Amino acid sequence: MGCSWRKTLSFFLVFVPIYLHGASSQEAAPVGPRKPFFERLRRLEEQFRRFQEVTWTHLQNIASNYNVSYNVDVRFRSLAEESQAVAQAVNRSQASVQGELAQLKAWVRKLQRRGRKVDTRLRALDLTLGERSQQRARERKAHKAQRDALQDSLARLEGLVHSQGARLAALEGRLPVAHPGTAALGPALVPTPTQPEELGPTSLKLQRDRQELRAASEHRGPPQDSSAPLQGRREPPASGSHRVLSGTAPKDPRQQAWSPQVPGEICGVGPTLVFPNASTRNVVFLSPGFVTALRALSFCSWVRTASGRLGTLLSYATEDNDNKLVLHGRDSLLPGSIHFVIGDPAFRELPLQLLLDGQWHHICVIWTSTQGRYWLHVDRRLVATGSRFREGYEIPPGGSLVLGQEQDSVGGGFDSSEAFVGSMSGLAIWDRALVPGEVANLAIGKEFPTGAILTLANAALAGGFVQGANCTCLERCP
């Protein structure tokens, strides 16, 4: 822009003198006609004015263009400065980013090293845990095998113990007839030193039972008829007969003084419940029931029925099943038969025709989830047994446990055709399987097995016509 303006100004300065020189030379020419000359001069003046105007306009355009170019240059310089500042800022930020990246790379390298160490430790832990889990699995398998073997051995041992107990009971029933005196009982039951025998766990238990039977025979009076009911000979309590349920089973049987009673009497067995008729109002609750799950059960009681059939002795119901544990008989069943139910609909039919004679009898129903074995003892004698009945089952806690009625709902739904009519005494429940020696001692009133979880001391009358009494002897109960 500056160069073009300078060229135009130079051209104007050169052209004006030349033009003025030409005009002066024309004036010095010979005088001719004056009009054409003035006209030409006016035209030249007009041309000059137009030229001046054009030149002025052109100069103004040049000046304006110069100003614009100057402003553009200023802007370009400012932009260049700004771009330079931006470049410097970018350089500074790039430097800081590079520094941060270097720090991050250092941290990443540290984390990678730590990660490799952690991976190494994790692999070592995995190997250790794998070895331990395998070892624990092997130990669990070994423990399971040992437990199964122990359960099998225990089941076989229980079967042997109960069979030996039944044989001992049968022998005891025959011995008074075969040997009138008590002096012959010792050699007949206990092996002499000249007859050594290998004493395993079963033999030791058998020998103890024989010694107990021998000791019991020393207190027996003249031999009685073997067909008579078995008598309990417990020392009668000091108080007389009264209609309350405050009596309990002996807390510590070793502190009780046992002495023979009159033959034919059953004494000192504890509280007695009398169910006079088949009313559905005749019900007794055992509280608090089962507080823990049961994998074994023993139910023992003295029972006397007043009708030609057996009703419900025991009923345990929960919210999901009203027949978790039942000992009941209906008037439609075979007289003297009773259904032993664990976890409806599984049941076994037990023969109890011996109880229909209107006399007192001692019964024990025993069950264990190990191989599902069960036993029924009546007056110390094993009358029924079996296996594979609810094997591995657990009787759940938290239900309603009643005597004398069969529950179709928790605590209700009674039916008079299933009601018990008669008397119960000395009732007790254990959370384990009693052995034959304990059953025999309980039946003869020699010793009360330890660990009972429920007795008639836990009974609560729910109205109706049920009567409670503490009788010195069962034969004197109403």
From Swiss-Prot:
Q: Which UniProt keywords apply?
A: Calcium, Disulfide bond, Glycoprotein, Metal-binding, Secreted, Signal
Summed up, the tissue specificity of this protein is: Widely expressed at low levels with highest levels in small intestine, testis and brain. Very low expression in endothelial cells, monocytes, neutrophils and lymphocytes. Isoform 1 is not expressed in small intestine.
* Binding-site list for Ca(2+) 2: E406, D408
Regions of biased composition (Basic and acidic residues) lie at 208-222
Task: Name one cellular component (GO) term.
Answer: extracellular region
Induction context: Not induced by bacterial lipopolysaccharideS (LPS) or IL1/interleukin-1 in endothelium, monocytes or neutrophils. Not induced by PHA in lymphocytes.
What are the annotated disulfide bridges? C300-C364
InterPro entries in the record, alphabetically?
Answer: ConA-like_dom_sf, Neuronal_Pentraxin_Related, Pentraxin-related
Q: Per its record, how is this protein called by name?
A: Pentraxin-4
Q: Which residues form the signal peptide?
A: 1-25
Q: Where, by residue number, does the polypeptide cross the bilayer?
A: none
Where found, per UniProt?
Answer: Secreted
As cofactor, the record names: Ca(2+)
Source organism: Homo sapiens (Human)
Q: Which Gene3D superfamilies match?
A: 2.60.120.200
Q: What's the main place this protein lives?
A: secreted
Among PROSITE patterns, the record links this protein to: PTX_2
Q: Name one GO molecular function term.
A: metal ion binding
Cofactor binding: number and manner: Binds 2 calcium ions per subunit.
Where is Ca(2+) 1 bound in this sequence? D322, N323, E406, Q407, D408
Looking at the keywords, is Membrane present? Answer: no
